[in-house]
């Protein structure tokens, strides 16, 4: 988990350096929601989807796609959001 948090911080910083406002719900919601409680995890996912609806783009980093990322990508495609893909080194592919 700590490795994922560090990566999310790096990717968020990269977005700022590119002139964007990063939104990383998985950094915010675990501060006050219990990710091991199924009801609270679902609430966090719902909140994340609500926030994503306000974004102009969805950025995907890395080659490993978790189940949560897969769900977000599927939703973004379904909603017609612009997806951008990057390597772990923040190189767009």
Per-range role (PLM):
Residues 1-93:
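Catalytic phosphate/metal-binding cores of nucleic-acid and nucleotide-processing enzymes, i.e., regions
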């Amino acid at each position: 988990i700590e490795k994922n948090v560090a990566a999310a911080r790096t990717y968020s910083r990269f977005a700022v350096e590119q002139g964007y406002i990063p939104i990383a719900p998985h950094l915010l919601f675990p501060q006050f929601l219990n990710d091991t409680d199924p009801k609270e995890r679902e609430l966090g996912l719902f909140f994340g989807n609500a926030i994503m609806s306000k974004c102009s783009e969805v950025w995907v980093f890395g080659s490993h796609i978790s189940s949560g990322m897969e769900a977000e990508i599927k939703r973004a495609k379904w909603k017609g959001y612009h997806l951008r893909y990057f390597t772990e080194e923040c190189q767009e592919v």
